Amino acid sequence: MKVISIVNLKGGVGKTATAINMASILATEHSKCVLLIDADPQANATRFFGGENAPVKLCDVFTHPDAWDSYCWMTQVDGVDIIPASMDLLQLDVAAATADAKLIQNFADFVGDMCDESDYDYVIIDCPPGFTAVSIAGISVSDDIIIPAKVDAFAISGIDELTAQIRAVQTVRSGIRIAGVLVTMWHNAPVVTQGEQYLRAMDVPVFETTIRRTDKMDEATFARQPISTYSRWCAAARDYRDFVDEYLGKEAADDE
């Protein structure tokens, strides 16, 4: 089982869209069994998959860990389950920051049990924006980190800080790999092209695939459908499929 965290210090960069669409494509087009853990208090992935009314949420994993399979909620996408989020995760960050590091260890133990006992091929963690206790917990149990980034000055300037924080976690757990930055919301404009060139010159891996901006993404979100289902041949759907192919190719090369 491979654990992937989708992380960025900024919101609004396509983080949740990447988590949802990567999970869907792995399941529907690569026959993988995927668990999406919604670790963002905004719970957008949870609402997308209709998990708002699930009896247990991710916060319970941190505070009252139980058998891992009691938290997994089936979604409308065959092969994708979700552990839903709630606003209670905001309180969890306060608790972890002020008192109880055991919360993070509870999550690590939970994921460890899942690795040993479940049939999931991939666990994808949609981390909250910022470097919070919950995002640290997600990063610390991950094999790979993917950083979605919209090409603008603020997003690019935050990548250095984020990668420095991830590398600090790597000193404690060396098996974590920054798989790469994924450029999202790309469009053909000189400032975007210039920003992408700057990003690719930084000391961080960057995926060759970029995710193009399209109104179909917003439509798919309203329809609660992955983009590859809603509009299979639109630019973003093709880009997300290419991205997953590229990620799997990198994964295979690194595992050799």
Region locations from a protein language model:
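P-loop NTP-binding core
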Residues: 1-256
